[in-house]
């Protein structure tokens, strides 16, 4: 499967996320859903935020030009929200899966889909 297939067939087809991307730790976007304009700098800040949570607690999580309020996270998960739109990101060994979801999708639904793909990528060495 190509990276675009993972975005289209695993994330978007689930209907549990409304926009999604997979990128490298260097910020380069490998694949993204149609109309999802996330920048290399935004991805790089998300990746840095996994290591240094204070970057996100003070500056929020910016995706496609919109700043979301950081809610919680770990060394491999980031959760954020702004209004009716939520963010769920997962870091793997070489990649980061970034997703947006909108109500009525529940945070747990998006988390399940994103983390299932993330765990699979980890088992594949990514």
UniProtKB/Swiss-Prot annotation:
The keyword Isomerase is annotated on this UniProt entry: no
GO biological process, one term: regulation of cellular component organization
Coarse class of the protein's main subcellular location: cytoplasm
InterPro entries, A to Z: PFN, PFN_euk, PFN_sf, Profilin_CS
Protein name from the UniProt record: Profilin
Organism taxonomic ancestry: Eukaryota, Metazoa, Ecdysozoa, Arthropoda, Hexapoda
Family: Belongs to the profilin family.
Keyword match Cytoplasm: yes
A GO term from the CC aspect: cell cortex
């Amino acid at each position: 499967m190509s990276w675009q297939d993972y975005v289209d067939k695993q994330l978007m087809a689930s209907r549990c996320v409304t926009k999604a991307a997979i990128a490298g730790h260097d910020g380069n976007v490998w694949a993204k859903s149609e109309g999802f304009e996330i920048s290399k700098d935004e991805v790089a800040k998300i990746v840095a935020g996994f290591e240094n949570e204070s970057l996100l607690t003070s500056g929020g999580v910016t995706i496609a030009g919109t700043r979301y309020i950081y809610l919680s996270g770990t060394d491999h998960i980031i959760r954020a929200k702004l209004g009716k739109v939520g963010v769920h990101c997962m870091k793997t060994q070489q990649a980061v899966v970034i997703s947006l979801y909108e109500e009525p999708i529940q945070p747990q639904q998006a988390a399940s889909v994103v983390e299932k793909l993330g765990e699979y990528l980890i088992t594949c060495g990514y």
